[in-house]
């Protein structure tokens, strides 16, 4: 695969110069020396122009995107993405059409790569003056300017991720990831290092930019420290997590640890093509790099994930919201932040690990001992979210070796389930990010674990909505997950509740902002439940003092979640919480002026119960948790009055937050209860009893 390196700008060519390029030997040779065989390119475009009619000049419906971080932009190189249903042959036809129309206007363009296996589109080098023309071409969905990506690196780590039963001896987990292949997109790798010798295949793939301040590439073997270290963390003989996993190395970062979005996309397509040509067992792709938010990068990750590939990436080392970076912001990617030996967030000078709702979990990422490229027996200590991501890639390889049929959703849920919980000091994170950032540090599952029919659930937060009254936020579950409940949260308390809606064949959680509000979050409880069938039952506002109630009507369906939505701006106060009458079926109870929604599901062996915890006096926080063996599927506040900020699930605990009672003058009439719905599968109970 060729190297994509040049980043020079393109300028319009006047007709005399264009003729000179076509006819003048000296001019043609000069241009060839600079940019390759452009004389042939121009002649070809003349021929192409004769054979292609211009498309009708409709207004552009496609959109243009570029990196929000100006220093990382690479103007002059663009990824043109075609619409989803576009036939494969149209990628090359559209590229030729662009070249022909650009040549007619006196511009040269160069097609650097045509995507066939990852997404429909192509990579083109051209003047920014041609963007309007390109956006009007048939089949074009959007165009994204290329941008830079960077490596994210600035033996306690193995002990931290190992279950307690292993620690008395040494780190020797079963199977060692031998059934899994890990692709590493990084710098090159010193494959003869004793840690990884015989475990790594360095592919011939290379797509890296020129180094800053130079006009050449150093040999890969002269700058393979980052990739060598990460390869050792994943599967090194002494310091590796998955000692049996095999690695394949793709070079997408240069000697300065810098690459491009386009180069990484071509690397991902290389993996997809390899997967199609020679299908193998489970694949893990490690992306220990970060760039600014990129729609096309995230879309490519989604395509690869839906093809069955597990992608693990670094959250980034910018002490910032991970949702502002790619591929960390891609929902289909497992995004990993970094912690130190004390399970605290890693600080790197004035920066540190990224955080926020786009992070799935944390892993060891400070002073990690691994292979050094200085010599074949050298080791070095490195820090960063790249190292943390390498740990999780190793754990993923271990899990997939034990259960090769796991889907991405099942693997992610297990990573979350077996993580160490509530060990990170949240004060390190900005105040507005603490509730959004998962307090989880990755760990291997115990060897005696049997997943069976265990019910796994996780909490997914939406992006923050806008501040207008009609603004909404939407939280979505992954492709193989089921939305079992929906809640909302607003720091100002000004919200109009939430409800489950159907969108594109999937259920989503939609939260509603209120007048004067600062925005709202939607919070989805996403679970793995085979053969599940769910529906929503709604009761309109009762208008009576007893409140609004609704329960599951269909036989065999059980209550998995409650939500409420109201149109009035202020629900006002409510007498002490109206709890579920004892002895009656599980039901959702809410404010008399609110519509109440019950999420009702049927699945083999599924049983659920409601747990409530109310405090007579107003409290800023009320919690209720499910017992061992039960999984939290629903979390709501009762009643959902306007002084309640919202409800959300943290692992197996339902948390209800209210306004600061010391400043609001709240009374006992504004007391609130936390309502948890806890579910389990009888199949799991029976299986556990049989093992005892």
From Swiss-Prot:
Q: Kindly state a single biological-process term from the GO annotations of this entry.
A: proteolysis
Q: Which GO terms describe its molecular function?
A: apolipoprotein binding; low-density lipoprotein particle binding; serine-type endopeptidase activity; very-low-density lipoprotein particle binding
Q: What's the cofactor? A: Ca(2+)
Provide the primary localization: cytoplasm
Identify the glycosylated residues.
Answer: 533
Domain Peptidase S8: start-end pairs: 155-444
Q: Give the protein's recorded name.
A: Proprotein convertase subtilisin/kexin type 9
């Amino acid at each position: 695969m060729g190297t994509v390196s040049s980043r020079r700008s393109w300028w319009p060519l006047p007709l005399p110069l264009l003729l000179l390029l076509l006819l003048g030997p000296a001019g043609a040779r000069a241009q060839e020396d600079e940019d390759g065989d452009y004389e042939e390119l121009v002649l070809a475009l003349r021929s192409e122009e004769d054979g292609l009619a211009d498309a009708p000049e409709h207004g552009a419906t496609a959109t243009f995107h570029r990196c929000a971080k100006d220093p990382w932009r690479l103007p002059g190189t663009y990824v043109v993405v075609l619409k989803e249903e576009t036939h494969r042959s149209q990628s090359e036809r559209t590229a030729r059409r662009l070249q022909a129309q650009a040549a007619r206007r006196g511009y040269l363009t160069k097609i650097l790569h045509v995507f066939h296996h990852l997404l429909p589109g192509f990579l083109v080098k051209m003047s920014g003056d041609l963007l309007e023309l390109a956006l009007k071409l048939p089949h074009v969905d959007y165009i994204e300017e290329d941008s830079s990506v960077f490596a994210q690196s600035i033996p306690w780590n193995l002990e931290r991720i190992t279950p307690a039963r292993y620690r008395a001896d040494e780190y020797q987990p079963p199977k060692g990831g031998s059934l899994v292949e890990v692709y590493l997109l990084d710098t090159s790798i010193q494959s003869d290092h004793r840690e990884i010798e015989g475990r790594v295949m360095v592919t011939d793939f290379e797509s890296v930019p020129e180094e800053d301040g130079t006009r050449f590439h150093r040999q890969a073997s002269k700058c393979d420290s980052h990739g060598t270290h990460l390869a050792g963390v994943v599967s090194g003989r002494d310091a590796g997590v998955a000692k049996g996993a095999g690695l394949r190395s793709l070079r997408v970062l240069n000697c300065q640890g810098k690459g491009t979005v386009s180069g990484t996309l071509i690397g991902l397509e290389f993996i997809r093509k390899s997967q199609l040509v020679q299908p193998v067992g489970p694949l893990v792709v490690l992306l220990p790099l970060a760039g600014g938010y990129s729609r096309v990068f995230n879309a490519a990750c989604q395509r690869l994930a839906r093809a069955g590939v597990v992608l693990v990436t670094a959250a980034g080392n910018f002490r910032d919201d991970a949702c502002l970076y790619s591929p960390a912001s891609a929902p289909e990617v497992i995004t990993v932040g970094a912690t130190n030996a004390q399970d605290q967030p890693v600080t790197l000078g004035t920066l540190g690990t990224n955080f926020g709702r786009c992070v799935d979990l944390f892993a060891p990422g400070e002073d990690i001992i691994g292979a050094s490229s200085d010599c074949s027996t050298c080791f070095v200590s490195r820090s960063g979210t790249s190292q943390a991501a390498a740990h999780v890639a190793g754990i993923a390889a271990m899990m997939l070796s034990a259960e090769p049929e796991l889907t991405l959703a099942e693997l992610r849920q297990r990573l979350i389930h077996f993580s160490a919980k509530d060990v990170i000091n949240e004060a390190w994170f900005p105040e507005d990010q603490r509730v959004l950032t998962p307090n989880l540090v990755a760990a291997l599952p115990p060897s005696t674990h049997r997943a069976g029919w265990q019910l796994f659930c996780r909490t997914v937060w939406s992006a923050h909505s806008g501040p207008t009254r009609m603004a909404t936020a939407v939280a979505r579950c992954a492709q193989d997950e089921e939305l079992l409940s929906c809640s909302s949260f607003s720091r100002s308390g000004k919200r109009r509740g939430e409800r489950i809606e159907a969108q594109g064949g999937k259920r989503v959680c939609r939260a509603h902002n209120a007048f004067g509000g600062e925005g709202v979050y939607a919070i989805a409880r996403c679970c793995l439940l085979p053969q599940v069938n769910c529906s929503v039952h709604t009761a309109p506002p009762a208008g009576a003092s007893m409140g609004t109630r609704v329960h599951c009507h269909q036989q065999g369906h059980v209550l998995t979640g409650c939500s409420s939505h109201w149109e009035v701006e202020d629900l006002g106060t409510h007498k002490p919480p109206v709890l579920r009458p004892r002895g009656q079926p599980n039901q959702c109870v809410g404010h008399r002026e609110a519509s109440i929604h019950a999420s009702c599901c049927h699945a083999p062996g599924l049983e659920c119960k409601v747990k409530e915890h109310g405090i007579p006096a107003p409290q800023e926080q009320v919690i209720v948790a499910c017992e061992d063996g039960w999984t939290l599927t629903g979390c709501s506040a009762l009643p959902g009055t306007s002084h309640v900020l919202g409800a959300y699930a943290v692992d197996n605990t339902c948390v209800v937050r209210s306004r600061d009672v010391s400043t609001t003058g709240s009374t006992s009439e504004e007391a609130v209860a936390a309502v948890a719905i806890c579910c389990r599968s009888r199949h799991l109970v029976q299986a556990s009893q049989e093992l005892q």
